[in-house]
A protein has these predicted regions:
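A conserved acidic beta->alpha catalytic loop
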Residues: 76-84, 125
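Short, flexible, basic/aromatic active-site loop/helix in glycosyltransferases
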Residues: 149-155, 163-185, 189
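Acidic donor-binding loop at a coil-to-helix junction in glycosyltransferase catalytic cores
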Residues: 209-216
Length: 275
């Protein structure tokens, strides 16, 4: 079986000037064909200086297969590169958020969403064709107000496929076990979806640099369940972001294992607030 995202890599980590015009036009046409006047789902991208990643993300979204009517919108966090131009070239309605942070950008997308459900999308991430449908299927279940999923990293010269598989398998197991009692700790913004009305009611924190999505999940718990989806058709693929913050993949693995062991008690207890 081939790698589903392989063709998108030809425009990933590349400036927009190098993007084939045929690809841009294909993405534009396919996205136009997906946009609904009466969406059930809002697919909301945020991006800050994501010129080298956004087209690949949009290309993957243009090939979504979804039984639910949807809209795709974007939020440009006042980028200094050609991020906004890519939204325009691909025909994606977008909004400019001048206050910088993921929280402000997510909130901007939420405020403009028309769908019953809001799907977080990160511009440096690619999503499989059935991603949105699978997430919404979970949200449609009685009592579910939010859904989180899993993600993989793109293998490269510094990160072997097998090394990544070991790292991801260990991380996935921990996130899954954690999701039973403390699902908010298993939520990551790039693979998170939720009820639009309830998120507007709780709001999204804008006073923190990271963790606004987990905090939103914590607030949503008062209304129902945060489900955890492990299906491969809901598994996104992304670059390295914070996984490289601790140096090598092995060092990242050690740091995360140590943190997991220190917090192992949390796997068995619920928590209503964090300080």
């Amino acid at each position: 079986m081939g790698v589903w995202y392989k063709k998108y890599l030809q425009v990933y980590e590349r400036p927009f000037a190098e993007a084939p015009q045929a690809v841009v036009e294909e993405v534009r046409q396919k996205i136009a064909g997906l946009q609904s006047e009466n969406p059930v789902v809002t697919v909301s991208l945020i991006g800050y200086n994501e010129e080298k990643h956004l087209l690949a993300c949009l290309w993957s979204l243009s090939e979504l297969q979804c039984k639910y009517p949807l809209e795709i919108i974007g939020v440009d966090n006042e980028s200094k590169d050609r991020t906004a131009e890519i939204f325009q070239a691909c025909g994606v309605p977008y909004y400019t958020e001048t206050q910088h942070s993921c929280g402000f950008a997510r909130l901007c997308g939420l405020n403009h969403a028309r769908g019953k459900y809001h799907i977080n999308i990160d511009s440096d991430t690619m999503y499989p064709p059935k991603y949105v449908e699978t997430m919404v299927d979970a949200l449609e279940r009685p009592g579910v107000v939010g859904v989180s999923s899993l993600w993989s990293y793109i293998p490269d010269e510094e990160h072997s496929r097998w090394g990544l598989k070991l790292y991801e398998a260990t991380r996935d197991l921990h996130l899954w076990l954690q999701s039973f009692k403390r699902p908010e700790l298993s939520v990551r913004g790039l693979v998170f979806a939720y009820r639009t009305d309830l998120a507007r009611k709780t709001g999204i924190r804008t006073d923190i640099i990271r963790g606004e999505d987990g905090y939103l999940a914590l607030q949503l718990k008062q209304f129902g369940k945060i489900a955890f989806v492990r299906k491969r058709r809901a598994r996104a693929v992304t670059g390295y972001g914070t996984v490289g913050a601790d140096g090598s993949l092995f060092n990242s693995f050690k740091v995360r294992v140590a943190n997991g062991l220190r917090g192992i008690g949390g796997l068995f207890t619920k928590k209503k607030e964090y300080k």
